[in-house]
């Protein structure tokens, strides 16, 4: 079984072909990604109109390249998976219309994938992970702790009440005059900084629910930065290190709460998983691995190229759905918002 995956929900244009190898393990035959960082850098963030136009310009060629590098052709593909949301609606529409056209012309099943679900299922592609597992899904637009019980069966244990983790990193980078994208720049600066110089708050620590709040942390950093202006290079590094250390502490505390809640909705987890762009952050990965070890769990995070948006995760989610007979018709809509996990019942 071979699935073509198409991803256009934000500022990466991606296409990939995924299959199932020995012992039903996933295998990536090709994974083509074109980033739009250069197009958006001058604006300090993603401009939806620019993103949509960039998708239009390259998507057809990228799909052709993905098929070629996979050593296959469209008639040999068993299904066409596409991220139908959530995301910037212009980009989502471009990917979805392209996938619908290919499915119609080639007479292949259309598999409309939730972009967040694709992140959630990535460890099954990379590590063959069994259900259920606890997922920290953290990106520029989303931060959630989810009990992943099965394909299409997700229980949200916690979410952010304001900024997503990746969004907070990006805003801090912009405030400090760092480059775009902000997350990697903050992490790079933090490597040369003192994480104990600034006593930044750890919002929500000790709360019974597994929710996040990062706006107060971001405000506290801004106050410190304004107090020190003009900022020396060491000031910037120390601010980044202190901010990152605070985020790590918050993440670990929230994960502890979610682990306690997990048993009530899904039994015993097979692993602690991090996915999404923020899962590429080394400090967060190390802290989560240590936390998992403390409670006797393995820690799983995708290889760095699969943390960000990519076509392989879309293709894999489509493959998982196709194996269950979950096929979509050509009227499936594009969605700017598309929650993928139900909230856990109130305690």
From Swiss-Prot:
It comes from the Bacteria. GO terms for molecular function: iron ion binding; N(6)-L-threonylcarbamoyladenine synthase activity. Keywords: Acyltransferase, Cytoplasm, Iron, Metal-binding, Transferase, tRNA processing. Fe cation binds at residues 115, 119, 309. Its main location: cytoplasm. One of its GO terms (cellular component) is cytoplasm. Substrate binds at residues 137-141, 170, 183, 281. Binds 1 Fe(2+) ion per subunit. One of its GO terms (biological process) is tRNA threonylcarbamoyladenosine modification. Transmembrane segments: none annotated. It catalyses: L-threonylcarbamoyladenylate + adenosine(37) in tRNA = N(6)-L-threonylcarbamoyladenosine(37) in tRNA + AMP + H(+). Pfam families: TsaD. It is an enzyme of class 2 (transferase). Its EC number is 2.3.1.234. Its cofactor is Fe(2+). It is found in: Cytoplasm. Required for the formation of a threonylcarbamoyl group on adenosine at position 37 (t(6)A37) in tRNAs that read codons beginning with adenine. Is involved in the transfer of the threonylcarbamoyl moiety of threonylcarbamoyl-AMP (TC-AMP) to the N6 group of A37, together with TsaE and TsaB. TsaD likely plays a direct catalytic role in this reaction. Belongs to the KAE1 / TsaD family. This is tRNA N6-adenosine threonylcarbamoyltransferase. It comes from Methylorubrum populi (strain ATCC BAA-705 / NCIMB 13946 / BJ001).
